[in-house]
Amino acid sequence: MAAMTMGLKISIVVPAFNEEKLIERSLQSIRDASSIFSRVGWEHEIIVCDNNSTDRTPELARAKGACVVFEPINQISRARNAGAAVAQGQWLVFVDADSFPSAELFAEVAAQIQSGQCIGGGVTVELDQSVRWATELTRVWNSLSRWRPWMAGSFIFCEARAFRELGGFSRELFVAEDIDFSKRLNQLSKMRRQQVIILHSHPLKTSARKIHLYSLREHLQFLLRSFLGLGKTFKNRKACTAWYDGRR
């Protein structure tokens, strides 16, 4: 049965740390895609959480019309949570600042919200540049994501009430916070007899910059440390260089 969705507001939260190279393009994509929400009679807002940037990220975000909030501790979980804390919408959409959602993707999100059967979800991803090993790894992730279902942090949509009931993203984790949140949302969805949906008809285009900024050896070393550390690596910011060393 379709949910009563008249008068909804969608809050789009964009965590950003030193994203001056991509933030304008990302926000323009979000703004263009958000017209879908207006067409179904919903309001929307765009919130950028400046995660202690040292470049022009906050200024560029404000110039694009986003509401900008500040989180002083460099951690993706804290940045998303800080943005969600000021969000006024009944639904939250988290989009990374190096990702570029399409109107077709937002239309799918709107349809899931209107269905009343979905508590939240994510989408498969597609790199904006083709690198063979990275493309293959992305395919593996997309298959795993749909099977589990696990949401990639680059794009997560969620009922705001459910997000707050779960306490948001874990502040213990510097990476893999999206998988942790996915597991907890899956548990809640079963209690509510709703679904966590991984969309796949219109994948999220996301930047392949990490593939070029960090060597294959560096990526493999991180995966090995993560495996041997049994997850402890995810709680150590210094070990998560590809997310926190500021290379852009």
Task: Give short role names for the model-derived ranges.
Residues R56, V95-A111, K183:
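Acidic donor-binding/catalytic loop of UDP-sugar-dependent glycosyltransferases
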Residues A162-G167, L173-R193:
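A short, conserved alpha-helix in the catalytic core of glycosyltransferases
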Residues E19-S38:
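Short, well-formed alpha-helical segments that are part of the catalytic scaffolds
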